[in-house]
């Protein structure tokens, strides 16, 4: 991947959507929920504060995160799907 996020943006690789239900039924593509968790693959340098200093990012590459269902912008690079979102769109770090 050749993407470098700017400011307080984060690039997340969404986890794969569930293929089947707990009961063993396969879910068609039209019925799959968008994943709300994934792995951080790149982070920007941070957001500039009003006084000009850069506030460091809390999330780091490799962390698993939870985010809103409609958070971020979907992009495809080299056949892989990613989300670009602001750090504030991330609700929690898993683990």
UniProtKB/Swiss-Prot annotation:
What is this protein for, i.e. what is its function?
Together with the chaperonin GroEL, plays an essential role in assisting protein folding. The GroEL-GroES system forms a nano-cage that allows encapsulation of the non-native substrate proteins and provides a physical environment optimized to promote and accelerate protein folding. GroES binds to the apical surface of the GroEL ring, thereby capping the opening of the GroEL channel.
MF (Gene Ontology): ATP binding; metal ion binding; protein folding chaperone; protein-folding chaperone binding; unfolded protein binding
Membrane-crossing ranges are none
Q: Where in the cell is it found?
A: Cytoplasm
GO biological process annotations for this chain's record? Answer: chaperone cofactor-dependent protein refolding
Task: Cite the residue spans of the region called Disordered.
Answer: 12-38
Q: Which GO terms describe its cellular component?
A: cytoplasm
Keyword tags: Chaperone, Cytoplasm
Where does this protein have compositionally biased stretches of type Basic and acidic residues? 12-22
Per its UniProt record, what PROSITE patterns does this chain match?
CHAPERONINS_CPN10
The lineage's top-level taxon is Bacteria
* Chief location bin: cytoplasm
Gene from which the chain derives: groES
Q: What is this protein called?
A: Co-chaperonin GroES
Q: Which family does it belong to?
A: Belongs to the GroES chaperonin family.
* Gene3D superfamilies for this protein: GroES chaperonin
UniProt subunit comment: Heptamer of 7 subunits arranged in a ring. Interacts with the chaperonin GroEL.
Repeat as a keyword of this entry, yes or no, is no
């Amino acid at each position: 991947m050749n993407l470098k996020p700017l400011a307080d943006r984060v690039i997340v690789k969404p986890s794969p959507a569930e293929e089947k239900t707990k009961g063993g039924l396969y879910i068609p593509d039209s019925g799959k929920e968008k994943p709300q968790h994934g792995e951080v693959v790149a982070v920007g340098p941070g957001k500039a504060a009003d006084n000009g200093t850069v506030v460091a990012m809390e999330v780091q590459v490799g962390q698993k995160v939870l985010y809103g269902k409609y958070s971020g912008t979907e992009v495809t690079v080299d056949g892989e799907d990613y989300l670009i979102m602001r750090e504030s769109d991330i609700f929690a770090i898993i683990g």
